[in-house]
Structure formats: structure tokens, C-alpha cells
């Protein structure tokens, strides 16, 4: 995207700004490259975009999640583990990995290594943990185990409802 900061503020960022004013809980950051803002990194890896613009200028204090790190914009240009570390240091709270167990493992290993080595500071990690826990608390999300679901029972109930609203064969 070839927009400068003025164009972004007056056009592309308007929906984000409005969502933030209306207490959006989370924002997903895309892997788009904003050449005139940060010519080196896509938005999902850019401290300029996430911390300076989204958090400081737009005053967003909710959860920032990356787009899927297994997308070509990342995997064709970066090591997925290094990209995850960069995303967290840029200000993302959650790194999304949608495809491949090995990808998820690599990201987790690299993030763990980065925290242990100090590449990701404890302070930075605490900020993300706080925002995520605050969001979980707001929606009363817990880590309690959910009982297994009886699919047969659910299908029975669905069929009962559908049958109540179905026309008899001769009327159809």
C-alpha cells in the first residue's frame, strides 16, 4: 500500500479509529506492507504500525492479533519463528498460526527461546498477558474443561425443530 500517514489517517484508518472509539476488544493486523510508513516490515511485524500508530496514536489498549503467520507474505519472506518474535516485539499479543503442527511448534519454541534470552522482555510479555486476561475476564472465559458433546442428542433436537417447521410432503 502506497499511502502516507495523512492518507491513512483520513481514509484507511477511519474504520479502525471508529472501532476503537466504540471499545473494540481486539484488532487483527494484516501482513500488508505500508511502504511510506515502514518500508522494511509488513504491518504485522512493524513496531511503527502496531505500537506507534495503533497503540499510541489511536489509543488502542485491547488485544492485537496477527493475521495467520503461515500466509505466503510471511513464509516466503521470513522464518516463521523469527517473524513471531518480531510480531510480539512490535506489539502483538497473540500470534496466529493456522496451519501445520510443526509451524505452531516452531513459533512456540522461538517465542520461548526469545523470552528466556531476553529478546522479548518480561515487561513486554506481561503487557500481553494482562490484555489477554482482561479480555478473558470480561467475557467470563475460563480454562475449565467442557463436557463432551452428545452429537446424536444435538442432531435429534435439530431434526425435531426442523420437522416442526417442515411442510407435509403433499403440500410441498
Where are these regions (language model features)?
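Alpha-helix-loop-beta-strand connector modules within alpha/beta enzyme cores
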Residues: 11, 43-65
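Glycine-rich tight-turn/loop motif centered on a GG-T
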Residues: 1-10, 37-44, 114-121
Amino acid at each position: 500500500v502506497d499511502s502516507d500517514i495523512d492518507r491513512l489517517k483520513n481514509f484507511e484508518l477511519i474504520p479502525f479509529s471508529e472501532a476503537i472509539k466504540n471499545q473494540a476488544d481486539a484488532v487483527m493486523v494484516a501482513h500488508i506492507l505500508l511502504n511510506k510508513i515502514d518500508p522494511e516490515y509488513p504491518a504485522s511485524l512493524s513496531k511503527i504500525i502496531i505500537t506507534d500508530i495503533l497503540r499510541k496514536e489511536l489509543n488502542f489498549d485491547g488485544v492485537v492479533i496477527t493475521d495467520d503467520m503461515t500466509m505466503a507474505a510471511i513464509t516466503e519472506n521470513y522464518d516463521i519463528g523469527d517473524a513471531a518474535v518480531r510480531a510480539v516485539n512490535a506489539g502483538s499479543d497473540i500470534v496466529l498460526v493456522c496451519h501445520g503442527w510443526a509451524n505452531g511448534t516452531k513459533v512456540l519454541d522461538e517465542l520461548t527461546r526469545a523470552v528466556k534470552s531476553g529478546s522479548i522482555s518480561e515487561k513486554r510479555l506481561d503487557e500481553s498477558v494482562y490484555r489477554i486476561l482482561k479480555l478473558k475476564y470480561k467475557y467470563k472465559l475460563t480454562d475449565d474443561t467442557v463436557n463432551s458433546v452428545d452429537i446424536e442428542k444435538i442432531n435429534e433436537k435439530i431434526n425435531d425443530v426442523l420437522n416442526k417447521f417442515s411442510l407435509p410432503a403433499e403440500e410441498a
